[in-house]
Amino acid sequence: MTLLESIEGPEDLKGLDAAAMEQLAGEIRDFLISHVSATGGHLGPNLGVVELTLAVHRVFSSPRDSVVFDTGHQSYVHKLLTGRQDFDTLRQEGGLAGYPSRAESEHDIVESSHASSSLSWADGISRGYALTGQHDRHTVAVIGDGALTGGMAWEAVNNIASDRDRKVVIVVNDNGRSYAPTVGGFANHLKDLQASVQQGVDAVRTDRRYEQTLAKAKHLLTASGHLGQAVYRGLHGMKQGIKDVVIPQGIFEDLGMKYVGPVDGHDLAAMEQALTNARNFGGPVIVHAITEKGHGYLPARLDENDQFHSVPVIDPATGKPTGAASARTWTHVFRDEIAAIADERPDVVGITGAMLIPMGLQKMQLAHPERVVDVGIAEQHALTMAAGMAFSGLHPVVGLYATFLNRGFDQLLMDVALHHAGVTVVLDRAGVTGPDGPSHHGMWDLALLQIVPGLHLAAPRDEATMVEELREAVAVSDAPTVVRYPKGAVGAPLPALERFPDGVDVLARNGEAGGPQGEQRDVLIVGVGAMCVTALEVSERLAAHGVSSTVLDPRWVLPVADSVVRTAARHRIVVVIEDGVRAGGIGSLIRQQMRAQGVDTALNEVGLPTEFLEHASRDQILEHTGVTAQRIAQDTLASVLGTRVPYARPAHDDAAAPVSSSGPEPR
């Protein structure tokens, strides 16, 4: 049995000597490299926090003391130390989650993987302990330097610092990166702190007796008249000046919090001492740990892009992917096309939130470095800054993962849309994303965005329509436009049979038409974006059972095109297939538009339930939620055979007549 296998919980660490702890750290690294290489996952971040996490669990007593991990992708070591070593199932259906999970362990508190929230959690937890008399309980928040670029973290620091008696320890895991190198003024400030030297000073400054001595000296001097007050001001100013030169804690202590560090995050003894000092102080303390992402694994350290932030299945010896060469992805299409657009249009600028490479903006940045801005993990700022850029005559393209749009929704609504700003938002990883779990699925955007006045939303089905719709989006100068697409390979081309004048594509007409004018079919299938693949398969399955159908791709799903409504009037049933939540989704909106225009055709909305969907593969999740061609075809066939709904009367004489455009007109 290895030493790691003998660890069933954090208490098992308490009796280990220094040599055993070093051995355990090595075993954990070997375990992570072996197991995460086999399943895929966040390898680099976890290799960088082995000693840090060991020290946290040695000094504090989880779950009595609450340990919160910001973002949570660096919690693998924490899982290993809290009795979860079945990593063969990591990020697989029914197996270990890739992020903290309350269902797995009482040691896990925060499940969301959205960055910069841990300090607000720590503020709330510690306030709760104080108000309920649990003064012996500590709250520890582990947050990366990348997450500290998010404004929410500083809102929490502002509140935590105002109460000097709450037992909050903030461990800054400073590896200089989020996905990629951390950017901005705060990142530069941390680099300045890294250059400082303070050995032994932290032990004094976090001693309550030091604070008490300073308080007594201040009281005696300020109470002794003008001369004493002048002496105090002089001594205090001298102390501050010397401190800022020798040990520049800077912004942290200016906010009223004790600062400990910088500490070598891979030195177990140093980390334990720093955390012990912080714990014993009894008030809010920042512990600044310097770590290396991918520490101890050469392939990760040599990866310039993101130091193995997240890996597929790889060969642990080389770090190279073991599967077939990656197919062209949606991100690749965006990467190439936005770079081409930027070459043609000097007014187009790119904005990203700490995701330059994952979003595909690096190619544009290499060609036009002054026109790509990485704002850090700051979606709110990104969108309002984009509105300002639009006001000054630029056309910003903001690249976000779909799940992170939620963080900047107010800014999209009130700063971009209200001001009719020509801003394009590109949403990668829309829909079901798979193994990263509920906080990474991009399934909320379709419902959220349809309530934004004047917004145009495109959902491309293949590479050609992606290129078209991105170019159409950046041609709009007086309204927000959004282009959404899923994670993964872009797939084969899906050519249209016909394009209506308002931009809606007819992808298929299967089966014999009927009705009084010979133009009606049984089922109209509307595919939203990448779900057009499923829509076409449903149509083929229905045709095999003698049920006729038409397949439409609206291309621009917001606003709803009139030709979609008129085509619906010539069918007995409409089926809308989308990879967002059904509640308030595109199907719901099409139904509203149909009823508003007097079209009473029955409509079935096929999408995701309003639930937090657990981690599994994309196909498994779609199977469980009923969003598969087989299930949709079965349900639709039953509806057709069981219905007595007559063909709806056509709303107009010609479903393909020129109508007002659903896609945005360049302006």
UniProtKB/Swiss-Prot annotation:
Keywords: Isoprene biosynthesis, Magnesium, Metal-binding, Thiamine biosynthesis, Thiamine pyrophosphate, Transferase. Mg(2+) binds at residues 145, 175. It comes from the Bacteria. It catalyses: D-glyceraldehyde 3-phosphate + pyruvate + H(+) = 1-deoxy-D-xylulose 5-phosphate + CO2. Disulfide bonds: none annotated. Coiled coil: none annotated. Catalyzes the acyloin condensation reaction between C atoms 2 and 3 of pyruvate and glyceraldehyde 3-phosphate to yield 1-deoxy-D-xylulose-5-phosphate (DXP). PANTHER family: 1-D-DEOXYXYLULOSE 5-PHOSPHATE SYNTHASE-RELATED, 1-DEOXY-D-XYLULOSE-5-PHOSPHATE SYNTHASE, CHLOROPLASTIC. This is 1-deoxy-D-xylulose-5-phosphate synthase. It comes from Kocuria rhizophila (strain ATCC 9341 / DSM 348 / NBRC 103217 / DC2201). The gene is dxs.
